[in-house]
Amino acid sequence: MSSAVPTNSDAAAYQARNYQLEMLEASMKENIIVAMDTGSGKTHIAVLRIKAELDSCPPDKIIWFLAPTVALCTQQHKVIASNLPAVQTRTLTGLDKVELWTEQAIWDAILKDVRVVVSTYAVLADALSHGFMRMSRLALIIFDEAHHCMRKHAANKIMQDFYHPTVSKFGPSAVPRIMGLTASPVVRSNREELFTIETNLDAVCKTPRAHRQELLKFSHRPELKQLLYEPPDPMGLQVSSQTLRALIEAWETLDIEDDPYVKRLRKSSLDGGALEKALMTGKTFCREQLKRFVDRSRHIFEELGEWAADYYIYTSIQHLKTRVQTSYMTGDWDEAERAYLVSFLSKLPAADIQITLSDAACLRISPKLEALIGFLDAMDDPEFSGLIFVKQRATVSVMTDLLAVHPRTRERFRSAAYVGWSNSSGSKDFLGNLLSMHGQLSTLDDFRSGHKNLIIATDVLEEGIDISACSVVVCYDKPPNLKSFVQRRGRARQKQSTYAIMFPAEDSAFDLAKWQTLEQAMIEAYQDDERHLQSAIELERVNEEVVERFTVESTSAVLTADTAMAHLHHFCAVLPSQPYVDMRPVFSVETDIANLRRGIVILPNCVHPKVRRSEGQRWWRTERAAMKEAAFQAYKSLYEFGLVNDNLLPLTNKPELKVNKLGSIPSIMEASEQYDPWVDWAYSWSSPDIHQSRVVVRLNGAKDRELCMRLAGPTVLPPLAPMTLFWDSETTFTVAFEAPERVPHVPLSSVEDMRTSTVVYLQATSSRLLSTKQDFTALFGPDLPHTDLKAWLQMYEGNEPAVEVYSRRRDPMLMGVVRDCSRYNEPLLFRRWVESGDSPTTSVVEMECDPFPRRRNLLHRQTLATKKLENDKEDTPEPVNKMRTVAADQCTIDRLPFSNAILGLFISVVVQQLETELIATKLYETILRDVGFTSTQHIITAISAPSAQALTNYQRYEFLGDSILKFSVSCQLFFKHPNWHEGYLSEGRDEIVQNPRLTKAALDTGLDAFVITKMFTPRKWSAPLISERLERVAGKRQVSSKVLADVVEALIGAAYMDGGHAAAQACIRRFLPEINLHSLDTRTLSRSVAPEGARQTIHDRLKRHISYTFENESLLVEALTHPSCDYDASTQSYQRLEFLGDAVLDMIIVSAIFNHPVQMPQGHMTKIKHALVNANLLAFLCMEFAIPEERASVEQISTLQFEVISNEELVELWRFMRYRGLDLNNARDASLARHRALRDEILHSLQHDPHYPWQALSRLSADKFFSDIMESILGAIFVDSGGDLAPCEAFVERIGLMSYLRRILDENIEVTHPRNVAQQLAKSNIQFLAQRMPDEEGGASYQCAVRIEEVEAFVVRGCLTAEEAEVTAAIDAIDLLMERVNGSASVAS
């Protein structure tokens, strides 16, 4: 069966309360009166209308919301203020004593910067009457309960005396727009009355038509029920209630001459007329107070019974005495009058009031109340919520107290009184007025939350005030008119609810029939709605064919009207999900004068405004066909806009649709062998162009203690950076390289001499005999011209017996390395000669020698032997001396002095550095030639893997490059694809920056050959030979794919360090050609990505507080637009800007960390970055980022004098977010409540604690939108400034993030996550198992079990989020583990 409401098979659905948007659209076109049932959301339509008007009207205009009662004003203002937290709003009612504001200055001060005023009708009418307010100042007037705009009502006075005359004189542009709100049953009841209201308000009554079906889903009709009771005995007053009888008798016999007012007038000769009037009318203050008190007491007795009357009289007297004793009364009540009243009432007999009774019969209540209690007692509903309407305020208070003590009701019903606040400030009823405003402040909130389940109220709760839907509504007295009948009935909105009216059993059949007739009229009205719906359903059975068809030429993919609806829903389903947002498309239908329909579809606001709203191009008889065609046009538009691919599928990365072009890349893969520069040098020796560099070695940096040698090669030598070599803990050598120079005309013989000198140096410090091959690729020699090499070799090559050296008495300073022939030529360091024996012929020559240092890895300080510690005691013995004595006849001594021989130890290190430099130079000259590096210094760091254990590795640069790449790709996608929503942008970025993509880039460019992974091992090192390199064939090696990806990112970081962003972009472009920011004109694009036609106004103070002046303010509007903001079709949500701002923030934070003077390892930098961009920290800063704003209030300083008091309030950034939704409101308020509770703790931690506040921030658990708008504003600034990071950095500084970063860096604040700390303490033998725990009320909490060494140690329960549970558990685990460690240490000691 077809239906006007699409079924599941249609793959379409309406969003909840979609008719509210329909009414909003209608109100933007003309003045309207929104006529909808009670509880169907009229106030929310008004809020949407206010938001729309604020976005378009000048900032000096005011929106005025009118309501009939003070209570309703208070409620509506609360709703408006909650939904417009950044806008200055205020109420103006009798509570403010507005009627006494007689100066324009007071009104001007109160309304300064106020955009929305909520008041009673009379306040605006009087303000207009006295000229304190003008129609020209108003942008919009909203009339709540608009059916009051009739006859002499203040609402009608506003229109007749001011609106209509202004229209007649100046035209429609001179008056505000009008919106009325009323309950549709009231309007339907009288068409003539409706026409009058429309004329008075210059508006047209509108009821949702296109979504009538949905409206009916949210309105429930209660069952009408009559409660009969026996009327009271007319003679009952004479036989019961002794206290009431005494009060009446005392009142009737009261002598007016005893009245203090009359006595005062008789003593005065000034005003005889006043005395005569008082005696004639019998009206004085005291007599009027007593008269009303007697009347109320009698009414209480008749309505509620004897106990209630006695209770009322007794409580009122006690209340009066208390007020007199505490001087609570106002100064205009004469002391004598107080004493007179107290004296009069004290003479009454005391009533016997028993509060705690077990027998209901002892309460002596009226038959009417007995019937009510019987009705309530019969209610068998655990979810009961009820409302009882009574006539008088006194009845409200007494009935509430009586139900609280009655045995049949006190356990089941949690009663509360509500009478509103009208006239409460100016009331002269000092006697018998038991209800205070303060006592009912929380009544409605308690009722909504379920803390109270029964409210007794006057007719103040009939209309307007938003209370929860009730299951029972009781009229204790018959409704006075149809309006009251309808309004009260509208309060019973729960399913299967009851609407009860109490009747005396002897009431005439006419009255009973009257209400039955009214009920039948209401039933018929609703049946009329249902007939319209049934008619629509019958119409939908018409088979109306929609033949729309679209074909993609390249793939032959086809879109038809029958498939478009499903396609459109799938497109929305894969959009980035957001809390508090329904991502389904919104369908609506408009009707023309021929009753034909055209479909409209609106997509979520993360979709670009150009294709967010689509209309059908034809008019149809059925809604089904209209919506089908609208869906077709919408999806076709998505394809044409580039949001759907040629297969007519979303550009999504969902598994079922993804085609992974990269394939599967293993973690360990085959890559090119590390580039060997000595192969190129080996070939170069066939026709050498010899270059050399002077190598200068200084001991402990002293210039007067230096050694020199020369390094030569067959081609140009790259510049080499100085090195520091660590001999021992007290001795270092600095190796410096002078600028290389070409050496022309070097004969072959000299080259051979250099090879021989290289052997001399290498052999001098080696215990093993070198190979006979001497075709070294790199040559070393003394610091002499090549023509002097032969003489040098003749002098220093080889060795001689030690005995011969001894006989020549060589200077010990010129001694070479001693070699013990008996121990395989073990090298030793000569100390002194030792002779033993009695005569020269029998003496034995020996040498005292030190062992030759075994240490060869001179590059690393950490391999040094530990020397004597500074805190050692002076008598600590020195380590055993390893000096040896060897026989001279078993030793030889090298001719090369040890002072020169030591240079041989440095050759391996020099060659290793030269090799690294040659690899970097080759990379610089080939793959990176267009990047623009100025030197190879940063390249060496970027290509050195940690496994090589070199002095430097790529990890820090990879940390920097990762953020630069993310930033660059984010910018590229954002500016290149202004049509893409955040989901596409995120998936597109992930595809590019993922490790497999970077690994492939490294392989495609040949970068894999230049990644240095080989570890330098000096003990196994051998000088590279020409013969070996000429025979070498390049092979493969096993490399981690992540290492290749890391090196790409590290090179990007190196390029940034070398040449800033320009070099980094060139490097990115080399490996990822599709990323080319230089080809994008960001200044032009910053305007093109802005929403078109945005007219929203932004608070000037916000713009100043951000410290950035937007050229395109619509970007700031977009940055503040939450995905739930569905009422603005011209602005996209902030998600795109938040995507960009996230990358900008990363770039700023990472740059600051990286450029700090203290170099930190990558792991620590990563921890700091994660702590700084933590969503809860950003959310906290968002809540703290506030704008000072002036507010004015009026204080009464005397009877007729008022003073304007100015004060300053802080308006936080989050208040400016544009959104819609009660759930979001509630979540926001809950987050703010947690912020208030945790604020001092978090601020103290950020300013003083040595640890990052992980636990406090996890307990904050702020909703994501708080941090999102920080990042989206950052993105907006970046776009508007044309890609300039400087103003972005200024904003990050302004919110306080940079100052905390500096504190972390300067004071070494511990930022390690507690979970990681616990894992370190437990040596990773610990598990945290977080789990969601549903509760009986439908909510949930989180717990986290901690297992240490496979044993459950404890469980943390009752946390708001899994993160809070895990952080709390980790902190407790740290305490436990530290106790164990300390306990073990104590036992050990």
From Swiss-Prot:
Q: Which residues form the RNase III domain?
A: 920-1060, 1099-1282
Cross-referenced InterPro entries? DEAD/DEAH_box_helicase_dom (IPR011545), Dicer_dimer_sf (IPR038248), Dicer_dimerisation_dom (IPR005034), Helicase_ATP-bd (IPR014001), Helicase_C-like (IPR001650), P-loop_NTPase (IPR027417), RNase_III_dom (IPR000999), RNase_III_sf (IPR036389)
EC number from the UniProt entry: 3.1.26.-, 3.6.4.-
**Domain Helicase ATP-binding per the UniProt entry, residue ranges:** 23-203
Q: Which GO terms describe its molecular function?
A: ATP binding; helicase activity; metal ion binding; ribonuclease III activity; RNA binding
Binding-site residues for Mg(2+), renumbered to this chain: E1138, D1268, E1271
Q: What does the function comment of this entry state?
A: Dicer-like endonuclease involved in cleaving double-stranded RNA in the RNA interference (RNAi) pathway. Produces 21 to 25 bp dsRNAs (siRNAs) which target the selective destruction of homologous RNAs leading to sequence-specific suppression of gene expression, called post-transcriptional gene silencing (PTGS). Part of a broad host defense response against viral infection and transposons.
Sites where the protein binds ATP: M36, D37, T38, G39, S40, G41, K42, T43
Q: Which SMART domains match?
A: DEXDc (SM00487), HELICc (SM00490), RIBOc (SM00535)
Alphabetical keyword list:
Antiviral defense, Antiviral protein, ATP-binding, Helicase, Hydrolase, Magnesium, Manganese, Metal-binding, Nucleotide-binding, Repeat, RNA-binding
By sequence similarity, the record places it as follows: Belongs to the helicase family. Dicer subfamily.
Q: Where is this site: Important for activity?
A: K1264
Q: Where does the UniProt annotation place the signal sequence?
A: none
A Gene Ontology cellular component where this protein is annotated is: nucleus
Q: What is this protein called?
A: Dicer-like protein 2
What is the organism of origin for this protein?
A: Aspergillus clavatus (strain ATCC 1007 / CBS 513.65 / DSM 816 / NCTC 3887 / NRRL 1 / QM 1276 / 107)
Zinc-finger: present as a keyword of the record? no
Record-level GO BP terms: defense response to virus; regulation of defense response to virus; siRNA processing
Q: Domain Dicer dsRNA-binding fold spans what residues?
A: 564-658
The cofactor(s) it depends on are: Mg(2+); Mn(2+)
Q: PROSITE patterns recorded for this chain?
A: DICER_DSRBF, HELICASE_ATP_BIND_1, HELICASE_CTER, RNASE_3_1, RNASE_3_2
Residue ranges annotated as motif DEAH box? 144-147
